[in-house]
Every structure is written in structure tokens, then in C-alpha cells.
Curated annotation (Swiss-Prot):
Protein name: Phosphoribosyl-ATP pyrophosphatase
Pathway: Amino-acid biosynthesis; L-histidine biosynthesis; L-histidine from 5-phospho-alpha-D-ribose 1-diphosphate: step 2/9
Organism field: Methanococcus aeolicus (strain ATCC BAA-1280 / DSM 17508 / OCM 812 / Nankai-3)
Keywords on record: Amino-acid biosynthesis, ATP-binding, Cytoplasm, Histidine biosynthesis, Hydrolase, Nucleotide-binding
Gene from which the chain derives: hisE
Annotated family: Belongs to the PRA-PH family.
Length: 96
């Protein structure tokens, strides 16, 4: 199993179980009315930070911020009931 798939499975489990102290649980419950808002806010924030790191040509910061962005996108996908395999299928479809 690849590391992104493993991370995705952990995220799904934390969304389901909502363990105390879990950052994923916090993201998915921070805004009781519309939980997606906090997740979308974080995706936007991390996207901006990734862009700034790229513009600054700071390789280490770009790697760090890209990992943050990918993590938050995985949370967004999992919270919306999208499976990792569905994302991979879309990548496969685009290769043709």
C-alpha cells in the first residue's frame, strides 16, 4: 500500500471515530453547522502557502507546504465520501 493511500485510510477512520485530540476530527467538527467550511478554509490556506513557497523558490518550504495541501485535500475528499480509488481512476482516465 502506498503512503498516500495509508494516510487516506487513517483520515477516513478518524472522520468516522472522531478520537479526542485528532486534528482530522477537529477539522470535521469545528464548524457544527457546516463542517465543510473549516476544511475548505484549510485547503485554501495551504494552497496559498504552497504558491508562496513556489514563488519564493524555497524547495524545502515547497515540499512542506505541498504535503500540507495534499493532506487537507485528502481530508476534503474523505469527508465528501470520495474513495482514494475514485481519485486514482480519474488520474488513469486522464492518461488516455
Amino acid at each position: 500500500m502506498d503512503i498516500l493511500k495509508e494516510e487516506f485510510e487513517i483520515i477516513k477512520q478518524r472522520i468516522k471515530d472522531k478520537p479526542e485530540g485528532s486534528y482530522v476530527a477537529y477539522l470535521t467538527t469545528a464548524d457544527k453547522k457546516t463542517p465543510i467550511n473549516k476544511i475548505c478554509e484549510k485547503v485554501g490556506e495551504e494552497a496559498t502557502e504552497t504558491i508562496l513557497a513556489a514563488k519564493d523558490q524555497d524547495k524545502q518550504e515547497l515540499i512542506y507546504e505541498s504535503a500540507d495541501l495534499i493532506f487537507h485535500i485528502l481530508v476534503l475528499l474523505a469527508n465528501n465520501g470520495i474513495e482514494y480509488e475514485e481519485l486514482m481512476e480519474e488520474f488513469e482516465r486522464r492518461r488516455k
